Regions:
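Short helix-coil junctions and helix-kink-helix linkers
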Residues: 28-43
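Long, compositionally biased intrinsically disordered regions
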Residues: 34, 66, 94-95
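A short, conserved structural fragment
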Residues: 53-65
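Minor-groove-contacting beta-hairpin "wing" of winged helix-turn-helix DNA-binding domains
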Residues: 65-74
Length: 95
């Protein structure tokens, strides 16, 4: 998987699981359970997810403080637009 495929998969799975608003997850949980990425991709996936949090054009934001590194989608619309703009697959019912 290339980097953009990993980013798209993370956003798609977070959207499908509706991790938005008050619903948040830890970075480790998103990578290992929500996105269900292969173990050999987990390290790079965590790096990409962390980069996306600090990138204003990405639909993912950090939430809360402390050591837990919680993330959530900025909005459903932002996630759908991101996937469309980056040749990602939008989950059924969100398009």
């Amino acid at each position: 998987m290339d980097d953009q495929e990993i980013r798209n998969r993370i956003v798609r799975k977070m959207l499908k699981n509706q991790i938005v608003g008050n619903h948040k997850k830890q970075i480790d949980t998103v990578v290992s359970k929500i996105a269900a990425l292969p173990t050999h991709e987990e390290g790079r996936s965590k790096e990409l997810l962390t980069e996306m949090v600090s990138n204003a054009s990405a639909p993912i934001e950090g939430y809360g403080g402390g050591h837990r590194q919680n993330v959530r989608l900025t909005s459903v619309e932002d996630a759908v637009d991101y996937l469309k703009d980056n040749d990602g697959e939008v989950p059924f019912g969100f398009d």
